[in-house]
Structures are given as C-alpha cells and as structure tokens.
Design a protein with these regions (language model features):
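N-terminal, post-signal peptide beta-strand-biased segments of exported outer-membrane/organellar beta-barrel
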Residues: 9-74
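Feature captures outer-membrane beta-barrel proteins of Gram-negative bacteria and organelles
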Residues: 34-40, 54-70, 77-92, 112-131, ...
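Long, internal scaffold/assembly segments composed of regular secondary structure
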Residues: 144-176
Length: 176
C-alpha cells in the first residue's frame, strides 16, 4: 500500500540497505554521520522513529557549529551527543544495559554491559576522513566477562581512475 511504500522510502536504514548497504556511497544521506562525523554540517535533523518500546530519536541542529543528541530506547544511553565546528565533527556515546534473567538450573543472575563510542571526522581538501573507536564489556556473575575493542577508519574522496569517479576505503578491526 501507499503508506507502507512511504514509510520504507523515508527510513534511512532500509533505504541504504536497498542501495547496496553502505552509507558511504551516498554522501547526501544522513547515515553518513556515523561513518564521517564531519558530514553533520550538511544536515539539520529532528527524527523520531517508532512509538513503542523500541523508539529512536535523532536531533541535530546549528549553523556553523552543530550540536545534537541521539536516543535509542533499547539501551540506557547515558550520553550520546554530537558536536562539530568548522570542518570537523565529533560523536561521543556512553551506553549501559542491565538485565536479570533466570537460568534453568540456577538462581536469578544479573548481567550488565557497558559500551563507549568515540567517532571523529574531518573534511579537508583531500576530502573526508572518519575514525571510530568502540569498546564494549559485559559483566556477569560467572567470572567470564567478555569484552571487545573496535577501530574503524573511513576515507572518501574524488579519485578519477578509468571509469570510476570516487573512492571509498574502509578499514575495521575488532578484538574480543
């Protein structure tokens, strides 16, 4: 129906997935903010997605200096902000989750997780650079507390070679 088509066409994640799955190829899409934080200067955003327990919201505003914050109701986001000035942008996130669950052969167990995110982007004459750092840890009562560290580097620029007009390079590393 028309309403379903309209909902899908305005949803960034679904739109990017249908176009190849990588927001880096579509410079004018707001999902680029997560790969290249300096692109936040191209957008003023007030988005609310959903009206249930899984609602998400994004707010980004300002002219020469950008301020913003993001909310995702499926985690206890203590801090998830955006700030940018001139040719650079910064995203900072600090999220926690906790849960109580019952195992079939044990008493109630409690587990909690902590996720810290930092992303920096710079636009220059060379083009756009994005760096992402993410650390995640889980604490439970079993003594085996998994953790991980992730590093990402993204580069996008005009690079006319043969029939190609642009270049997008992404490097991601994750340890656990």
């Amino acid at each position: 129906s028309f309403s379903m088509l309209l909902a899908v066409s305005f949803a960034s994640e679904q739109r990017i997935a249908s176009l190849g799955g990588n927001a880096g190829f579509w410079e004018d899409d707001d999902q680029n903010i997560y790969m290249f934080p300096s692109t936040m200067h191209n957008f003023n955003i007030a988005q609310i997605d959903g009206n249930d327990d899984m609602a998400k919201a994004s707010f980004l505003f300002g002219e020469s200096t950008k301020y913003g914050f993001f909310m995702n109701s499926n985690s206890d986001e203590l801090l998830n902000i955006a700030y940018g000035s001139g040719s650079w942008g910064l995203l900072v996130g600090f999220d926690t989750n906790s849960a109580k669950y019952t195992e079939t052969d044990a008493d109630d167990e409690e587990a909690s997780s902590l996720n810290m995110k930092l992303a920096f982007g710079l636009s220059s004459s060379f083009r756009e650079l994005g760096v992402n750092l993410n650390t995640h840890s889980i604490d439970n009562s079993e003594g085996d507390d998994p953790s991980s560290f992730a590093f990402g580097l993204n580069l996008r620029r005009e690079q006319p070679i043969w029939e190609f007009s642009h270049m997008l390079v992404s490097f991601n590393f994750m340890s656990n």
